[in-house]
Amino acid sequence: MIEKQKRKELLILNVLKNTEMPLTSTRIAEELKQLGHEMSERTVRLYLSRLDEDGLTTSSGKKGHHITERGISEFDLAKIFERVGF
């Protein structure tokens, strides 16, 4: 089972994976809320900062963030492990 922090990172990566354009933390928080996951803009920003450091997302300044190829691979791999039950 994936720990709480990793699950939140995967939720953010999922939102970014499903869009072509960069998204701001505000927009990501709104998308997560629509999916039934409450997360504040500040929390999203903190996770995005960590994801940027890990190379899973990149910042486009005030335009927002987008997922990298590495982020897509990480997301897909995590989903496979989650389905298998590791």
Per-range role (PLM):
Residues 1-19:
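Short alpha-helical segments that sit at the start of domains
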Residues 37-52:
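Short amphipathic alpha-helical interaction segments
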Residues 52-61:
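A short, conserved structural fragment
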Residues 22-32:
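Short acidic, hydrophobic short linear motifs in intrinsically disordered regions
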Residues 72-86:
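Short, amphipathic alpha-helical interaction segments positioned at domain boundaries
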Residues 30, 34, 52-53:
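Alpha-helical residues within the helix-turn-helix
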Residues 62-76:
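Accessory beta->alpha helical hairpin/"wing" motif in late/C-terminal subdomains of nucleic-acid enzymes
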